[in-house]
Amino acid sequence: MIHNISILGSTGSIGRQALEVARNLNLNVVALSANSSIELLEEQIREFSPRLVAVSDKKAADELRVNIKDLNTKVLAGNEGICEVAACDEAELVLNSIMGIAGLEPTLSAIKAKKNVALANKETLVAGGEIVTNLAKKFGVKIIPVDSEHSAIFQCLQGCNDKKQLKRLILTASGGPFFGRSLDELKNVSLEQTLSHPNWNMGAKITVDSATMMNKGLEIIEAAWLFDMDIDNISVVIHKESVIHSLIEYVDNSVIAQLGVPDMKIPIQYAITYPKRVKSC
């Protein structure tokens, strides 16, 4: 199991939960990055003592330098700084939970530095799937999915040695907070209702995307690149309880599924400890 980890997007929902896992596993957090939430980032720095941090917002980075001048942590700024954190020498694994397309370039930087990547940034593969997967093959790097559905598929595939035996991948979807509502009922839903996911505790953007089902469309593309699968062989089924996270079906019509409580710390921890499993927090 790894001992040193870098976490990109450490002040977001996945990043905060990743730090909980790192704390429970007693990992050495060598580098962190954030967009602009320097108050929380400072708390994280003072607890985990990373050697390197980066802040996208350059003004916020300047402020952070002043706030932690009593510490030995180096503060970098801008996208260049984020990419430097992604390629940090000491890190054995880079967990990328940056939101949106901003996560693509740091992923590429980590791969070029020959770092295995725990990927929670689906836009990396939606926008640059061919580039990322080809580069990972070139540098001998593993891309380990953190999204619960893709982590489930990844786990189900551990016993599959021949892709030709696969018939299809089956992603599950809760349907979000508005499943079963009519088009007329959807006209007057509020932001508060949209952000009230029935099962998962997630960031605002992905919660909205889940409510509209847009997130599932992105996940199909992500799965196609992660598992080198034709989109026609990827299905989606509604499973409101979010206990079955995803399934794989073989050509003999047998099905293997991965189940668990809807807690993102479980796939986060599996990505960090892979191929081992340890007691969860």
Regions found by a protein language model. Give the residues of each.
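Catalytic, metal-anchored helix/loop core of enzyme active sites in primary metabolism
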Residues: 1-281
